[in-house]
Amino acid sequence: KVANSTARNPRKYAIVTSIILLVMVAFIPTLKATGISTLEGFTKKPKSLIGQELLLQHFPGGQSQPTQILVSKDKSEAVIAAVKGISGVSSIAPEIQDPANPVVKEVNGKIVLDATLKVPADSSAARELIPEIRKAAKSVDNEALVGGISATFHDVDVAARHDRNLIIP
C-alpha cells in the first residue's frame, strides 16, 4: 500500500522526507556528546550506590581513582606545587606502590604523581579539570603526561565532539 502510494507520488514523498530531515538536522547543535558518571547511570539506588554517596560525603571524590601525572623526578616538586594550586585538586604526592615500604618507583628518571581530585573521578567536573592539570604540569615539565580515568574520559569526550562536528554536518 505504501509502496504503491510512493510510486504514484514520488515527488510528494521526496519533499515530505526532505522536510523531516531538515527539521531533524536543525536540532543537531543540541546534541550533547558528554557522558554520565557511574553514579548517574543507575535508575534505582542499589546499596553500592548508597555506600558510594556516603563515602563522597566524607572523603575526596577522586580518592579511589587518582589522576596520574608522569613527570621527570627532578621536576616533580615543582609540578606538585603547580598542580596543588588548582582548586579542584585535593592532594598530590608521588605514587607509592607499597605503604609498608614507602619507596617512590623511578623508571628512566620519571616518576608518577597521584593527584586526588575533590570530585568523583568519573564525573564531568573531573573531566573539566584535566586541561588545567595538563597545563599546570606542562608549564613545569614540558614532557609531563596526565592520565587516569578522568583524563581518559576527557579525551574520549574531546574525540566524540570532534567526530560529531566533523562527521554529522
Regions found by a protein language model. Name each.
Residues 4, 17, 28, 53-55, ...:
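Residue-level detector of functional hotspots within protein domains
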Residues 8-9, 140:
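Structured helix-beta-strand junction loops
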Residues 10-47:
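Transmembrane helices with small-residue packing motifs
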Residues 33-169:
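Structured non-transmembrane domains adjacent to transmembrane bundles in polytopic membrane proteins
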